[in-house]
């Protein structure tokens, strides 16, 4: 059964009050990294109900842009140094209003892939004749027959990271609920994160590994032969393993540490690479308080890119056979080591992009980005639907809050297993559900 989304005439939302204009704001070294400046991040947030959400959100965006006025500008390289920057033009944010001829439950709340409504119908499309990479932020609000709605965004990753996205969307929600100012005051200060001098750049080269036993991911039009699956992980069981780690090691670990260790081991066992083949687990660490500790107020506010990838590497046999607490220790020690470095060293730690292989795995924790706190007056989102990140990193996994409000469990969604390994992977993960 097919469903139709009807988009009304799009509009440009400008700040509701005069804002600084006519000047150029620099982006940081992180913001200007090549793989971020050409990365448009698509996200759908699913809400259960709302009264005229498009009207409310449109007005809230105009108010939020007074505080986040760079988002009303345009990305440009027409500067003295030719570097990517934000021109504060005040032109506004592209906003699309739409209606769907179905209920949320008819399309499974957009939780099953492939989506029952093509993502292009839910996401905002850029104006004809406009380069989408010049637009920092676009929005589409789609109302469903049941009263639910989606708040879908397309954002240029060069302007803000996941934490920044959460901060901005929370601010829009606060404006929608009648606040005069965002709870967290936005901070720009991109010039603090400068390009490192050559001596600060890590010279670490990728470790040689036996590629002959690693399956081809078969990239075709940004798609792979990777299967999608999800698990609802028991927080009681995770807390039991945290207690076991504390008893064995004498230190405290996080829910994330335990899930990441279990995921890495389960997948490594399921794919069955040669014991000496190197496998990796990558996740992002927020380094705001290290790099910007002299610039930020106590409540933060920096919304530029300030997440660095931490790549954990080990032989397949070690990860498959070690006690789980040892893998937790490996992950935790790597985090502690990275965060103990000084600002200059951290800025130089950004590894070059490389095409991922089946031996590589990444995990993103969407629970801690602030997105669940984006409340436009009717409560936070029921579901988050990231649409394109797994097509970039291939073997990706995501942590979400449980969709059942009364439960404290964690939902893990994975795009990291080919079909022939899926059953073994599920068997390994089942004792966490």
UniProtKB/Swiss-Prot annotation:
Q: What is this protein called?
A: Myricetin 3-O-glucosyl 1,2-rhamnoside 6'-O-caffeoyltransferase AT2
Catalytic residues, chain numbering: 157 (proton acceptor), 375 (proton acceptor)
Q: What keywords appear on the UniProt entry?
A: Acyltransferase, Transferase
What is this protein for, i.e. what is its function? Caffeoyltransferase involved in montbretin A (MbA) biosynthesis. Catalyzes the caffeoylation of myricetin 3-O-beta-D-glucosyl 1,2-alpha-L-rhamnoside (MRG) to produce myricetin 3-O-(6'-O-caffeoyl)-beta-D-glucosyl 1,2-alpha-L-rhamnoside (mini-MbA), a precursor of MbA. Mini-MbA and MbA are potent inhibitors of human pancreatic alpha-amylase and are being developed as drug candidates to treat type-2 diabetes. In vitro, is able to catalyze the caffeoylation of quercetin 3-O-sophoroside (QGG), although QGG may not be a physiological substrate in vivo.
Q: What superkingdom does the record give?
A: Eukaryota
Family (UniProt): Belongs to the plant acyltransferase family.
One Pfam family name is Transferase
Q: Which is one GO molecular function term here?
A: acyltransferase activity
Tissue range of expression? Expressed in young cromes.
Provide the top EC class: transferase
Source species of the chain: Crocosmia x crocosmiiflora
In the UniProt record, what gene is named as encoding this protein?
AT2
UniProt keyword annotation of Transferase present:
yes
Q: What is its EC number?
A: 2.3.1.-
């Amino acid at each position: 059964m097919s469903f139709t989304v009807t988009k009304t005439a799009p509009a440009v939302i400008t700040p509701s009050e005069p804002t600084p204009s006519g000047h150029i704001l620099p982006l940081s070294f992180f913001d200007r990294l090549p793989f971020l400046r050409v990365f448009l991040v698509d996200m759908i947030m699913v809400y259960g109900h709302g009264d005229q959400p498009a009207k409310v959100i449109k007005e809230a965006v105009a108010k939020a842009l007074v505080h986040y006025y760079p988002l009303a500008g345009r990305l440009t390289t027409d500067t003295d140094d030719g570097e990517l920057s934000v021109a504060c033009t005040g032109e506004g944010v592209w906003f699309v209003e739409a209606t769907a001829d179905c209920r949320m439950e008819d399309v499974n709340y957009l939780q099953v892939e492939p989506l029952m409504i093509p993502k292009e119908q839910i996401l905002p499309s850029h104006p004809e004749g406009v380069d989408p990479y010049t637009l920092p932020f676009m929005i589409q609000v789609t109302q469903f027959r049941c009263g639910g709605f989606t708040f879908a965004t397309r954002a240029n990753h060069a302007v803000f990271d996941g934490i920044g996205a959460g901060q901005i969307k929370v601010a829009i929600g606060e404006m929608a609920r009648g606040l005069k100012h965002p709870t967290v005051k936005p901070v720009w200060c991109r010039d603090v994160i400068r390009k490192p001098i050559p001596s600060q750049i890590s010279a670490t080269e990728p470790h040689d590994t036996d590629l002959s036993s690693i399956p081809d991911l078969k990239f075709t039009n940004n798609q792979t032969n990777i299967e999608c699956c999800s698990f609802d992980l028991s927080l009681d069981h995770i807390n039991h393993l945290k207690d076991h780690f504390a008893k064995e090691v004498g230190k405290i670990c996080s829910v994330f540490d335990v899930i990441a260790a279990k995921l890495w081991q389960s997948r490594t066992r399921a794919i069955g690479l040669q014991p000496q083949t190197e496998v990796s687990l990558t996740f992002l660490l927020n380094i705001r308080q290290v790099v910007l500790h002299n610039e930020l107020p106590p409540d933060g506010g920096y919304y530029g890119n300030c997440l660095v990838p931490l790549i954990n590497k080990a032989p397949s046999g070690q990860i498959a056979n070690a006690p789980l607490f040892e893998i937790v220790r490996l992950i935790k020690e790597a985090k502690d080591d990275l965060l103990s470095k000084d600002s200059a060293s951290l800025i130089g730690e950004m590894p070059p992009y490389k095409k991922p292989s089946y031996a590589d795995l990444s995990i993103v924790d969407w629970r801690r980005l602030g997105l669940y706190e984006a409340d436009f007056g009717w409560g936070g989102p029921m579901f988050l639907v990231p649409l394109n990140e797994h097509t970039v990193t291939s073997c990706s996994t995501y942590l979400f809050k449980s969709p059942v409000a009364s439960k404290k469990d964690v939902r893990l969604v994975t795009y990291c297993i080919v079909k022939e390994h899926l059953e073994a992977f599920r068997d390994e993960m089942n004792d966490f559900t």
